[in-house]
C-alpha cells in the first residue's frame, strides 16, 4: 500500500502552489511583471515523460517515484509524512472493509477546483 500511496500522490497531486513575482522576468519567452501571480503546477511535473516511464498511467507498483506532490527540498510540505500515513491507513481500512470494488465510470469522477484539488465524487460499485 505505501507504494500505491506514492503513485496516487504522483498521478493525482493535490496541491498547486502560487507565488507573487518580485521582479520583472521572462519564463519560456513570456514576460512576467513584478507583482504578478505565478502558479506552480506540481501535477504537470509529475507527468514528465523524461522523469517517469508511462507518466499518464497509474501504476500502483511503480518502483522509481520521486514525485513532487508535496514540493521538494527545504520547501517540502511539513505535513507530508502525516498525509502519507493518513492515506495509507485510509486505504488499508477501505480494502479491509470493501475488498472487491470497481470504478463504474472513470469519466464521471469530478474534482474540486482551486489550489487544493481532490475528488468530489467517485462512482464505484462494491461487488461480492
Where are these regions (language model features)?
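Cytochrome P450
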Residues: 1-128
